[in-house]
């Protein structure tokens, strides 16, 4: 590898000692029988997705697993391992489905960014240099990833698929997106 390539990788926290690798994972499918305001359990498809994710993660050295307190996230995380840390800051963005079918967000993106950033920072600091799995929710993840990519809110036209892996590398106050939407475990 050339010196230029090593420098480029270091700039993106690839192969840098002490980097914490946070796997930000969207929960598995839960939409069978979901009603507005519900905290649904995983659907049969979601349980299969969670098991495929668990098979992938079990091959890795994982320092800890964190989850939103919502049932769909907890069930996904507990399919991987029994020992799951719950963090309320990982909850979904507050929203409702409007009359015209559009989403009506009840929580400002700045609030989501603040709580998600604080959660990821705290988790990364607690497991410095390790790999951590964080199971959360689609809209909150999009807002957080949009912020990390330095895009304006609404400019990341991407919906993480169920159990997709989004890798964020953290070192000190630096957070770099390494992977978006990896679903190779579902193939």
Predicted features by range, described:
Residues 67-68, 114, 135-136:
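Short beta-strand scaffold positions
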Residues 22, 122, 128-139:
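Generic beta-sheet signal
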Residues 51-58, 113, 117-125:
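Generic structural signal for well-ordered alpha-helical scaffold segments
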Residues 30, 140-141:
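Short active-site segment of divalent metal-dependent hydrolases/proteases
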Residues 38-44, 78-122, 178-180:
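Phosphate-handling substructures
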Residues 79, 143-147:
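Active-site signature of alpha/beta-hydrolase-fold catalytic machinery across serine-
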Residues 2-84, 108:
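Active-site-proximal alpha-helix that buttresses catalytic centers in soluble enzyme cores
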Residues 152-176, 186:
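Domain-level recognition of soluble alpha/beta enzyme cores
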């Amino acid at each position: 590898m050339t010196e230029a390539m090593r420098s480029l990788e270091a700039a993106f926290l690839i192969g840098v000692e002490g980097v914490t690798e946070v796997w930000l994972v969207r929960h598995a499918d839960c939409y069978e029988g979901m009603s507005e305001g519900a905290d649904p359990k995983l659907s049969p498809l979601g349980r299969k997705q969670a098991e495929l994710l668990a098979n992938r993660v079990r091959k890795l050295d994982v320092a800890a697993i964190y989850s939103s307190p919502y049932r769909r996230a907890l069930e996904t995380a507990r399919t991987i391992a029994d020992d799951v840390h719950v963090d309320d800051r990982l909850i979904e963005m507050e929203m409702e489905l409007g009359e015209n079918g559009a989403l009506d967000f009840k929580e400002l993106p700045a609030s989501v960014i603040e709580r998600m950033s604080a959660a990821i920072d705290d988790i990364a600091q607690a497991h410095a240099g390790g790999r951590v799995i964080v199971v959360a929710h689609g809209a909150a993840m999009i807002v957080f990833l949009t912020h990390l990519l330095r895009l304006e809110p609404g400019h990341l036209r991407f919906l993480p698929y169920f159990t997709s892996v989004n890798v964020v590398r953290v070192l000190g106050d630096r957070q770099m997106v390494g992977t978006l939407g990896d679903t190779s475990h579902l193939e």
